[in-house]
């Protein structure tokens, strides 16, 4: 370990990419996962096209810079957690490494993350990019859910370090409920929910559009996003919450002030019901999506009930939140309450059906919140990549040259025993 440079940890999500060095408590950069490229439709001869292609390959921006370039085409290479455009992803990684991390890839091991149910072929593509294009000495591709479980060890609620638990990973583009037993994902039981951060933003945008006329149309989405991040919370009871706002509006209704990008004048809007109705679509999805009506607590319950019977209790006991969309105030508390109701009702029913002969042992339902939730996956990666074990399980350049990209199809679990 001595004298070795720290590993680079890169967590690419649908909306944001988190990057930094292992051993740190938070990522050095959090940038939008987008890339701005020049799309030219000029008709030129062969020789000129060759010159232009070389120049165009270098003429691109990523992250916040990409969003600010109106003359470029902005692309998002990752959709619903899975990489869709590998050429763009390679260029994206190029700037991540050289411009942001300012690292020499030959000197650092890399830990990259992957969504649940990622295909082995995708792991091979990742390995090819990292070993062929960037010549890295070692690569480990970690499952996001396992890293999120490791990150939850920082919580005071966690007594012992375990890699068994249910991870609710809700980012910008997708929400997954992933059961993990001893560090291995139970793939057949994963469920995904078509509601995530972006859907909440769209829903708030729609609510604001119906009521507030002063928002410039081209800024309505970013206004909705700011309202969501600044003011939203999860309420325990919808009807009571509506009554609160109706009886004592001045206490609950907030003001948001934005600046019109074109006229540079200020505009102010009132933020009322949107504060709690936004995140409420996790618990009442039919508000935003008529095709999907299953609340998140029922999805979690169904996932755990589909798992092998001997891991169900530990899965209920260790429900870990991860990702930016779980950051709403009281999200964990509401989820725990709803889930406990479902579980207790089932136990009560089984007792009644047995005519009182069965006395089921109560099930301990615990939803774990911790201060690393937003970057849980990155932070879990940072913790695990700073252990000596990490370097033993990494796939090295030597292995890659001997065997080929197929070595990255399987990445052994580690960090459980320590």
Swiss-Prot record:
This is Actin-related protein 3. It comes from Gallus gallus (Chicken). The gene is ACTR3. Pfam families: Actin. InterPro entries: Actin, Actin/actin-like_CS, ATPase_NBD. Component of the Arp2/3 complex composed of ACTR2/ARP2, ACTR3/ARP3, ARPC1B/p41-ARC, ARPC2/p34-ARC, ARPC3/p21-ARC, ARPC4/p20-ARC and ARPC5/p16-ARC. The modification N-acetylalanine is found at residue 2. GO terms for cellular component: Arp2/3 protein complex; cell projection; cytoplasm; nucleus; site of double-strand break. Belongs to the actin family. ARP3 subfamily. Detected in fibroblasts. It is found in: Cytoplasm, Cytoskeleton; Cell projection; Nucleus. GO terms for molecular function: actin binding; ATP binding. Keywords: Acetylation, Actin-binding, ATP-binding, Cell projection, Cytoplasm, Cytoskeleton, Nucleotide-binding, Nucleus.
